[in-house]
């Protein structure tokens, strides 16, 4: 561990000023999706997904794990993407703290929350699902508890890292929210077989994850990966298909008994402003 253990409250106090909220400009309790970026930090596609969710009537919160720690994109790309620091099991504390904090927001229906992660963010969510959350140190927190996770209905996991260090390789999940996995057929970080095998951890908990094998590379939905020497290639058609699946999944798992929310004008702001 590279830093002292935070309490859940202290971790949320650190993260909250850097969370960007998208959603209808009202105070009605609405279903919410929390979005967790990949190892290179927040890239434009994360905001695209958040805005799309907001237009459908959901609240969307983009959680930045790097700005609160003073980490630049270059620093994160060099160390986090290389696996030198901040593994999924540590960032899982950010996921838990964000759920705990945002579930208390009066504009959030705490019984209808989805978690969405891309690459490192998806890894962190998956690691969290394997943790009992009963003893200090789990998720790099002093006081982990699964109380806030009761309202987490669904997980959207886009090309999660599933190589060495990913807890789902060796541990079953202990929770079984509805899960939609996106596996990139040409992923250079986690081979297709390993990626699919990691979803077996969800099945061991009684979940029935739906997995879409997208015929693209890791990061296929992220603009900016178009050229050499990156092994990642942006595919706008696949990106649109992934966004459609994301929205359909949110509606299927978060819509209440009254059905689909009417489209609304979305706004964005730093959380709490």
Indicate where each model-derived feature is located.
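Serine-hydrolase catalytic machinery in alpha/beta-hydrolase-like enzymes
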Residues: 6-23, 28-108, 123, 220-231
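Conserved alpha/beta-hydrolase "acid-adjacent" motif
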Residues: 188-197
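C-terminal catalytic histidine-bearing segment of alpha/beta-hydrolase fold enzymes
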Residues: 208-273
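Short beta-strand/loop motif that positions the catalytic acidic residue
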Residues: 175, 181-183
């Amino acid at each position: 561990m590279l830093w002292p253990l935070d309490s859940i409250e202290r971790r949320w106090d650190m993260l909250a000023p850097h969370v960007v909220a998208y959603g209808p400009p009202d105070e009605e309790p609405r279903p919410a999706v929390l979005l967790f970026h990949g190892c290179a930090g927040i890239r434009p596609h994360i905001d695209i997904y958040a805005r799309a969710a907001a237009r459908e009537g959901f609240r969307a919160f983009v959680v930045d794990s790097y700005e609160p720690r003073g980490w630049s994109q270059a620093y994160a790309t060099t160390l986090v993407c290389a696996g030198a620091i901040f593994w999924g099991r540590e960032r899982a504390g950010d996921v838990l703290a964000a759920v705990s904090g945002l579930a208390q927001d009066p504009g959030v229906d705490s019984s209808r929350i989805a978690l969405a992660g891309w690459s490192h963010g998806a890894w962190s969510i998956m690691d969290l699902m394997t943790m009992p959350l009963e003893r200090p140190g789990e998720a790099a927190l002093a006081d982990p508890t699964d109380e806030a996770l009761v309202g987490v209905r669904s997980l959207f996991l886009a090309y999660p890292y599933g190589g060495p260090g990913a807890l789902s390789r060796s541990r079953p999940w202990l929770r079984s929210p509805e899960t939609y996995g996106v596996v990139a057929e040409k992923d250079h970080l986690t081979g297709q077989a390993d990626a699919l095998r990691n979803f077996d951890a969800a099945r061991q908990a009684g979940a029935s994850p739906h997995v879409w094998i997208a015929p693209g590379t890791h990061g296929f939905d992220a603009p900016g990966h178009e050229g050499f020497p990156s092994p990642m290639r942006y595919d706008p058609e696949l990106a649109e298909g992934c966004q459609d699946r994301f929205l359909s999944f949110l509606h299927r798992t978060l819509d209440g008994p009254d059905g689909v929310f009417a489209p609304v004008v979305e706004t964005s702001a730093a959380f709490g402003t």
